[in-house]
């Protein structure tokens, strides 16, 4: 097979132009690294996510990492609890939490479920809980449905 240098150059230039023009391969405007494939598959570098204060609760911060446009059925984000922080919450959605660092405690009905780095905690819809930590916690949360705020 005889391929001309001009054809190779043209193909390489098109590939480079496409890669540079494709926002999915660039960090999102979210202040953290998120890359999205045209198929809809996306990846977030969780160690680049910087959480923001949540609801005026001292020591609690979070950051949603996907939009409803990116993931219309499931929501996701990162939450941090600092040095003994806790807050009360009633879930009108199902939630999975994956502990990334520290210790996450879910207090419910006088009992406590505790997870550490790598552990997964499931909290069913309708649960009235306290998110808590004896030291600190950083965890990824995944919620269904994504538009849980509209669930009432």
Label every PLM stretch briefly.
Residues 78, 91, 108-110, 133, ...:
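Residue-level recognition of conserved beta-strand positions in structured domain cores
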Residues 112, 147-152:
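Alpha-helical scaffolds that organize eukaryotic protein assemblies
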Residues 12-75:
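A short, N-terminal "cap"/entry segment at the start of jelly-roll beta-barrel domains
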Residues 125-149:
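Ligand-binding loop in jelly-roll beta-barrel domains
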Residues 109-126:
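Short acidic-glycine-tyrosine-enriched beta hairpin
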